[in-house]
Each structure stands twice: as structure tokens, then as C-alpha cells.
From Swiss-Prot:
Keyword match Transport: yes
Organism phylogeny: Eukaryota, Metazoa, Chordata, Craniata, Vertebrata
Binding site for Ca(2+): D778, D780, E789
PANTHER family per UniProt: SPECTRIN/FILAMIN RELATED CYTOSKELETAL PROTEIN
Encoding gene (name): Actn4
Cited function: F-actin cross-linking protein which is thought to anchor actin to a variety of intracellular structures. This is a bundling protein. Probably involved in vesicular trafficking via its association with the CART complex. The CART complex is necessary for efficient transferrin receptor recycling but not for EGFR degradation. Involved in tight junction assembly in epithelial cells probably through interaction with MICALL2. Links MICALL2 to the actin cytoskeleton and recruits it to the tight junctions.
Modification N6-acetyllysine, positions: K114, K214, K592, K625, K779, K859
Name recorded for this polypeptide: Alpha-actinin-4
Chain intervals for the UniProt region annotation (Actin-binding): 1-269
Length: 911
């Protein structure tokens, strides 16, 4: 330090080395020249000079007292340069050259020049201030020099929002006094005359020292003295101004006011740093709390969706068949209700869950936080796998329902057909066993025997005709067994009874023939006409019975072609009716001829044809029945034809709409894929275009709703196929859901890109360059790059990731950042996040640790009281609940470890 006491030795006079100081940059010199508005050719205003002397003297003494000295007369005590050099050493904290020992003028000039050279070395241009004027006690030059020192060492470093020192100090005063009434700081002279601004500055930082509400604007002297006394007593700021001088001066000296106000700024700068540190911590904690809330929402939504999938899949995998078609149709209705009501909200939840997950990951990357890893079993991939399992079970369940309904329809048809044929057969066999067991031939005449033989032959013919029916009954019963008919036991019992009875009839028929043939040799007369009648009547009667069966037979058709085939067969049957009618007339003519011969020959007949039980009345009755059934069959076929025509109309209507909607969905999917790759214009333009595109898609929803209505009509009509279109309702539903999901995901990607761009300060040109590079290597236009494609993209952008050991290590590090889940793919969003991190600064754990250290007063730990004093209540309690106790050797009671807490926020340790 300068030995300002060593001034006793004799000086030798020599040439002056005074003059302006040198050095300093142009920028700093220009700044000082702007601040220095001294008119060096004129004398100072006496009032201003008085204020400056008092203020500058007090300011110098506030620093010189640290060295154990002071000045009394500012233009006299600096003349030898010793205290001037000492002042510069105190305020700069640097050593100046050793002063010259001697009291001669040359020694004083040299000492002052050393001080001026030191000032110039700090980038200050000393305009018209020379050592000779200071040594000669020039008051104006001395005050100007001190003002230059004050500007450089007390005011220059004050900067608020990149303003100059004077403007920064003024802006600081304006901000701190803004909430106070009657205070309007616009300058450094008249704005301070009433003293309220000084009191407001003190009250803003130390409210316990000033009772501001009791101050009056019309009592400036009291206000000024109150502020000066409080500042000197409690803030260690010496009294640099005189209240009466300020009040009685029309325009107080600006430099004196600035000097005094700068002392307040430096006194309160510590509080400003604490406020900045607290704001930084609050910002970091707010981001962390928001991310935790998003993580909790994701876990809850994912858990609910997976639970719904877990409950739904067993229901869809239930394949227990029902006994009746009504029960299966109820199952089908329940399934349609699931498709219409229960599933669509879950599809929307799944899409929203993916969007929330991507947004959360983007926010974590932007805030330099580790990627979010959901709980085990709740990853997006787990949800997609569960959803895929659900879709597979759903598809299999619908196919099973339709197959079961077809099976039950087939079973109902076969069961009814079995009952009809069995009833007809049982009616035919009724009494046949008793007839075959009858021993009437033992007492019959020869003619009777011959009649019995003929009758038996007719019966055998009838029996042979019924063989087909029995085989059909057995075949139907077998098919019912194979299709697992629920009442197959009764069917089998009835079928077995019919077969056993049929075998017994065959055996009885054979035995009776042998008995009749044994006595046939005794019989010679036979009525040929009755025989001919019987032989022709029996087949004709069987034909009529078969015709009645066919006319009453149930039919199930599903297409126009099938019903037209039935109509054609029916028309062909009707074309045979004239021949059948002629056959009937011929048979009746035989009976009439027999009656005529008997009457003409006075032959007494027994009344019935001995060879057959088919009388003309039966033939006529059955013929009338056939004639009645034909128009009924016509009506039934025409009704079914109308139904199938209606079904065909439904098919064509659905196909027309589906063939329009299906290609539209495919076209939109392709256009979205192209838009997501090309991405022309700004991101905002792209987002607006995509949202307009999304609205056009949503506006198309009525076409899909119309298709759903048409599909409902088709299902109600039990139409199972449609040859007019390859699109199914399920296919179109899936396509629509994928379209909505794709456009929502694309919009979300652009929004995340905007978020990334704004957060990281990426220009539109950079974003377009990144997109162009990404698209160039995205050969398959899949929206993601494989490792080799990503490496090529990085190399094209100038990253040193060549195929050597060092390049491989760097590339593996980059891959762990852009692909934390190790999926083997790098999305464009991850690529943008990486590029933005490489080109912009982000907050770090070290910054947060430094901020906590400011709040803790440079201690290695912080207390709960300090956190509650500096942070908002909720964030203070958040820190206290999560900070571990400090274990260091300098730990105090209640000490908390803010370092481990800060690193945990950035994933560098565990909370």
C-alpha cells in the first residue's frame, strides 16, 4: 500500500510529467466521455460545487477510513498524490507503483501521474485533467477527477437490462421505488428534493428501519435528514449530502446525488443477488413439480386403461357356445354395444395418453431432465401390446359369434326338417306292423289271396319308396350330432326307434311274402284293373306326398342367386303339374273302368280296392292339397325374393359408401405422411395447415356415421358377406382411428418442435436445415432414422463420429441421449432436441447449487428457516421435505444438504 506518511524527504525539482493519462479501450472511454458533462472552460455553480465537495469528500472518506485515514479539504489533501494513490488502492483492491519520496513539486506531479495512469489503465479517458492542475489545487479539476473515479469504480458496473451505468442506476431506482406513492424518479436532481425517494429505497430493502406512511411530501428537510441518518446509522453509508442545500437549490447537483445513490445500490446488491438466486430456484422447482404432476397423471391413466383391457380380454375370449340362437344374438348385441359405447372412449384415452407421454418427454428434454421411465408394465409399448391383444381377441370373438349364429341357424333348420320327416314316416308306419302280422290269408279265397299278394307287392313298392326318407332321417340325425345339437339325445333316440322299426318292417314284409307265395298257387283270379290302379296309384300318391313335403319344406337363403334357384326349381315343378294331372286322370279312369265292369257284370265288390289303400278320394284330396300349397309356396318364395332384393340393395348401398370412404381414408393417410416429411413453410404455418387438415378430417365424420348406420341395417338383416366391396366396417373403423391418431400425433410433433425452437432459440432456417438433413437420410420416409442413417446424418452436419474407437464412443454417447429407451430408432423430435442442446445453453445442477449457496450465505448447507425466508411457502416446503440432512463436519442443527438435492433434480443422483 502507498506510504502516504513518507512525505518528509527533500524533493528535487525537475520537468513536469503531467498531462492526460493514456490507455483504455475506445468503448470505455466513449462511455466515460458521455457521462462526463463538465464544462472545463467555465467555473462550477457555487451551490453545485458545495454539494460536490461535501458529497465527494464523504465518499472518499468512506473508503479511506478502511486504510485508517481521511481527508478534510478535497482540493488540498490530494495535491501530493499520496492519499489519491491510497484511495485508488482501497477501491480497486490492487497495488499501485511505489510513490516517490520527496516534497518537491516534481515528486508530487509524478505521484499524481501514477494515479492518473492507473485510472487510464482501467479504460478511462481523462479529458483535460493533468497532474499540474491537481498539484496546484485546481478545485474544478480535482472534483472532475474524483467524479471520474466514482464513475469508474462505483457506477460503471451497474447495469440493468444492458443499459449504461447512469441509465442502469436510474432504472434500478425507478423499479425499487415504483410501488411507493408520491415517488416518481425521472432524474438525479429534482426527483430527490423531497427526500421520499431516499426513504423509499431504504424501506424497500429494510422496511423495519423506515415508517414510510408517516412521511409527508411537504416536509422535505425532515424526510432527507431521516434518510441520511438511517443510512449512516444502520447501512454504514456516510452522510454525503446536506438536506438544506438540496432543498434550497433549484436543481441539486446530479453527480452528488448519483454518488450518494450508488452507495445505496452497492449496499443492497447482496439482497438483489439473493432475489435472483431465489427466482432461479423457484423456476427450477416449478418445472420439476409440473413434470412430477404430468408423470402422476400418466401413471394413473395408464393404470386405468390397462385395467380396463385386463377386464375386457377375458370377456372377449369367452367361447362357451349357447343352446339357442336367441342367446347368441344377445351376445352379438352385447358385442355391438361394446363396439359403439365402451371402446371409442378408450381409443381416445389411448391416443391422449401417447400425446401426454410425448409432451412430457419433450418438456423433460427441454428442461435438461432425465427421460421419464414409467413403472414396470406401464410403458407405451406395454399399452400397445395389451391393445393389440385386445384387438386380436375382439376380432376372434366377432368371427366366433357369427359362426355360432350360422351353426345354430343350420341346427334349427335341420332339427325342424328332422321332425317333419320323422312325423311323416311315423304316420306312414303307423299300423304297418299289425298289417304285416295279420293272418288273413288263412281264411281268404283264391281271389282274396291274389289280392293280398298284389297288395303286398304294392306295399313293398311303397316300402322301397320310403327307403330314401329313412336314409335322410338318419343323415340329418348324424349331422345334428356332428354340429353338437343341444337336444341330440332325443333326436338319436327317435332316429334309433325309426331305424329299428324299419328293420322290423323289412323282416315282417319278407315273412308275409313267403306266406302269401306259399298259398299263391291256390289263387288264380285277380282283378287286373285294381292291380293296375294300385300299381299306378301308389307311386302317384308317394309323389304327391313328396311334393307336399317339398312345398312345405323350410328354406334358408342368403343371396339373390339362391332364391332365384329355388324359384326356378319351383317353376320347373309347376311345369310338371299338367303331366301329373293327366296321370291322376288316368288313375281315376282305371278305377272308374273297374266300377263300370263290376256294375255291367253285376259283380259285388267289397267297396275298397283290395290291392291298395289309396282311394280316389285320397288322391283327389292330396291333389287339392298340392294345388293349395303351390300358391302358398309362390308367395313364400316371392317374399323371400323381395327380402333378398332388399338385402342386395343394402349390400350395394354399403359398398358404394365404403368404396368412397375407404380410398378417402387411405388418401388422407398418405397425404399426412407426405406433409410430415415435406413440412414446407414455418412451423406455425405447418401447425395451422395441419389443424385445418384435422378439421377437414373431423368434418368427414358424418360419412363414417352414415356407414355405421348402413352397417347396422346389414347386421340386423343378418347379412354376412358382400361381394361388392373389399372393405369391412371393422377395417374402416381401424383406418379411421389410425387416421385420427396419426393427424393428432403429427400435430403434437410440430407443437413439440415449436416448443423446442422457442425454448432453445432455434431459427426457422436452422429448423429447415435440420428437417432437410433428416429427410435426406430417412430413405423409407418412416419418420425415424436407424443408427447408421443417424450417424450419416451427424457426419453430414460436421460431427466427428467416424468409424474409429473415439468416434464410436462419441456416437454411443449421442445414441444414449437421443434413444434412451434403446428402441433402435431416432425420431425427428429427438434429433431436434439433440441439435438444440448442442447449440444452446441450459440450466445445470451446478447453477442451482450456486444459487442455493447464495441463499445459504456461502455455507455448505442450508437451514429450513433460510429456505422459508427466501422461497415461496409451497416451494420452500417442497425442498425441506426432499432435502437430506447435511452430514459434513461443519454441520449445524437442522442443516440440510442442498447439493445432493440439486443433482437429483437433474437425474445425477436419487432424491
Amino acid at each position: 500500500m502507498v506510504d502516504y506518511h513518507a512525505a518528509n524527504q527533500a524533493y528535487q525539482y525537475g520537468p513536469s510529467s503531467g498531462g492526460n493519462g493514456t490507455g483504455g479501450g475506445g468503448g470505455m472511454g466513449d462511455y466515460m466521455a458521455q457521462e462526463d458533462d463538465w464544462d472545463r472552460d467555465l467555473l462550477l455553480d457555487p451551490a453545485w460545487e458545495k454539494q460536490q465537495r461535501k458529497t465527494f469528500t464523504a465518499w472518499c472518506n468512506s473508503h479511506l477510513r478502511k486504510a485508517g485515514t481521511q481527508i478534510e479539504n478535497i482540493d488540498e489533501d490530494f495535491r501530493d498524490g499520496l492519499k489519491l494513490m491510497l484511495l485508488l488502492e482501497v477501491i480497486s483492491g490492487e497495488r499501485l507503483p511505489k510513490p516517490e519520496r520527496g516534497k518537491m513539486r516534481v515528486h508530487k506531479i509524478n505521484n499524481v501521474n501514477k494515479a492518473l495512469d492507473f485510472i487510464a489503465s482501467k479504460g478511462v479517458k481523462l479529458v483535460s485533467i493533468g497532474a499540474e492542475e491537481i498539484v496546484d489545487g485546481n478545485a474544478k479539476m480535482t472534483l472532475g477527477m474524483i467524479w471520474t473515479i466514482i464513475l469508474r469504480f462505483a457506477i460503471q458496473d451497474i447495469s440493468v437490462e444492458e443499459t449504461s451505468a447512469k441509465e442502469g442506476l436510474l432504472l434500478w431506482c425507478q423499479r425499487k421505488t415504483a410501488p411507493y406513492k408520491n415517488v416518481n424518479v425521472q432524474n438525479f436532481h429534482i426527483s430527490w428534493k423531497d427526500g421520499l425517494a431516499f426513504n423509499a429505497l431504504i424501506h424497500r430493502h429494510r422496511p423495519e428501519l423506515i415508517e414510510y406512511d408517516k412521511l409527508r411530501k411537504d416536509d422535505p428537510v425532515t424526510n432527507l435528514n431521516n434518510a441520511f441518518e438511517v443510512a449512516e446509522k444502520y447501512l454504514d453509508i456516510p452522510k454525503m449530502l446536506d438536506a438544506e442545500d438540496i432543498v434550497n437549490t433549484a436543481r441539486p447537483d446530479e453527480k452528488a446525488i448519483m454518488t450518494y445513490v450508488s452507495s445505496f445500490y452497492h449496499a443492497f446488491s447482496g439482497a438483489q443477488k439473493a432475489e435472483t438466486a431465489a427466482n432461479r430456484i423457484c423456476k427450477v422447482l416449478a418445472v420439476n413439480q409440473e413434470n412430477e404432476h404430468l408423470m402422476e397423471d400418466y401413471e394413473r391413466l395408464a393404470s386405468d386403461l390397462l385395467e380396463w383391457i385386463r377386464r375386457t380380454i377375458p370377456w372377449l375370449e369367452d367361447r362357451v357356445p349357447q343352446k339357442t340362437i336367441q342367446e347368441m344374438q344377445q351376445k352379438l348385441e352385447d358385442f355391438r354395444d361394446y363396439r359403439r359405447v365402451h371402446k371409442p372412449p378408450k381409443v381416445q384415452e389411448k391416443c391422449q395418453l401417447e400425446i401426454n407421454f410425448n409432451t412430457l418427454q419433450t418438456k423433460l428434454r427441454l428442461s435438461n431432465r432425465p427421460a421419464f421411465m414409467p413403472s414396470e408394465g406401464r410403458m407405451v409399448s406395454d399399452i400397445n401390446n395389451g391393445w393389440q391383444h385386445l384387438e386380436q381377441a375382439e376380432k376372434g370373438y366377432e368371427e366366433w359369434l357369427l359362426n355360432e349364429i350360422r351353426r345354430l341357424e343350420r341346427l334349427d333348420h335341420l332339427a325342424e326338417k328332422f321332425r317333419q320327416k320323422a312325423s311323416i314316416h311315423e304316420a306312414w308306419t303307423d299300423g304297418k306292423e299289425a298289417m304285416l302280422k295279420h293272418r288273413d290269408y288263412e281264411t281268404a279265397t283264391l281271389s282274396d289271396i291274389k289280392a293280398l299278394i298284389r297288395k303286398h307287392e304294392a306295399f313293398e313298392s311303397d316300402l322301397a319308396a320310403h327307403q330314401d326318407r329313412v336314409e335322410q332321417i338318419a343323415a340329418i340325425a348324424q349331422e345334428l350330432n356332428e354340429l353338437d345339437y343341444y337336444d341330440s339325445h332325443n333326436v338319436n333316440t327317435r332316429c334309433q326307434k325309426i331305424c329299428d322299426q324299419w328293420d322290423n318292417l323289412g323282416s315282417l314284409t319278407h315273412s308275409r311274402r313267403e306266406a302269401l307265395e306259399k298259398t299263391e298257387k291256390q289263387l288264380e283270379t285277380i282283378d287286373q284293373l285294381h292291380l293296375e290302379y294300385a300299381k299306378r296309384a301308389a307311386p302317384f300318391n308317394n309323389w304327391m306326398e313328396s311334393a307336399m313335403e317339398d312345398l312345405q319344406d323350410m328354406f334358408i337363403v342368403h343371396t339373390i342367386e339362391e332364391i332365384e334357384g329355388l324359384i326356378s326349381a319351383h317353376d320347373q315343378f309347376k311345369s310338371t303339374l299338367p303331366d301329373a294331372d293327366r296321370e291322376r286322370e288316368a288313375i281315376l279312369a282305371i278305377h272308374k273302368e273297374a266300377q263300370r265292369i263290376a256294375e255291367s257284370n253285376h259283380i259285388k265288390l267289397s267297396g275298397s280296392n283290395p290291392y291298395t289303400s289309396v282311394t280316389p278320394q285320397i288322391i283327389n284330396s292330396k291333389w287339392e292339397k298340392v294345388q293349395q300349397l303351390v300358391p302358398k309356396r309362390d308367395h313364400a318364395l316371392l317374399e323371400e325374393q323381395s327380402k333378398q332384393q332388399s338385402n342386395e340393395h343394402l349390400r350395394r348401398q354399403f359398398a358404394s359408401q365404403a368404396n368412397m370412404v375407404g380410398p378417402w381414408i387411405q388418401t388422407k393417410m398418405e397425404e399426412i405422411g407426405r406433409i410430415s416429411i415435406e413440412m414446407n413453410g414455418t412451423l406455425e404455418d405447418q401447425l395451422s395447415h395441419l389443424k385445418q387438415y384435422e378439421r377437414s378430417i373431423v368434418d368427414y365424420k358424418p360419412n363414417l356415421d352414415l356407414l355405421e348406420q348402413q352397417h347396422q341395417l346389414i347386421q340386423e338383416a343378418l347379412i354376412f358377406d358382400n361381394k361388392h366391396t373389399n372393405y369391412t366396417m371393422e377395417h374402416l373403423r381401424v383406418g379411421w382411428e389410425q387416421l385420427l391418431t396419426t393427424i393428432a400425433r403429427t400435430i403434437n410433433e410440430v407443437e413439440n418442435q415449436i416448443l423446442t425452437r422457442d425454448a432453445k432459440g432455434i431459427s426457422q432456417e436452422q429448423m429447415q436445415e435440420f428437417r432437410a438433413s433428416f429427410n435426406h437420410f430417412d430413405k423409407d420416409h418412416g419418420g425415424a432414422l436407424g443408427p447408421e442413417e443417424f450417424k450419416a446424418c451427424l457426419i453430414s452436419l460436421g460431427y466427428d463420429v467416424e468409424n474409429d474407437r473415439q468416434g464410436d464412443a462419441e456416437f454411443n454417447r449421442i445414441m444414449s441421449v437421443v434413444d434412451p429407451n434403446h428402441s433402435g430408432l431416432v425420431t425427428f423430435q429427438a434429433f431436434i432436441d439433440f441439435m438444440s442442446r448442442e447449440t444452446t445453453d441450459t440450466d445445470t445442477a451446478d447453477q442451482v447449487i450456486a444459487s442455493f449457496k447464495v441463499l445459504a450465505g456461502d455455507k455448505n448447507f442450508i437451514t429450513a428457516e433460510e429456505l422459508r425466508r427466501e422461497l415461496p411457502p409451497d416451494q420452500a416446503e417442497y425442498c425441506i421435505a426432499r432435502m437430506a440432512p447435511y452430514q459434513g463436519p461443519d454441520a449445524a442443527p437442522g442443516a440440510l444438504d442442498y447439493k445432493s438435492f440439486s443433482t437429483a433434480l437433474y437425474g445425477e443422483s436419487d432424491l
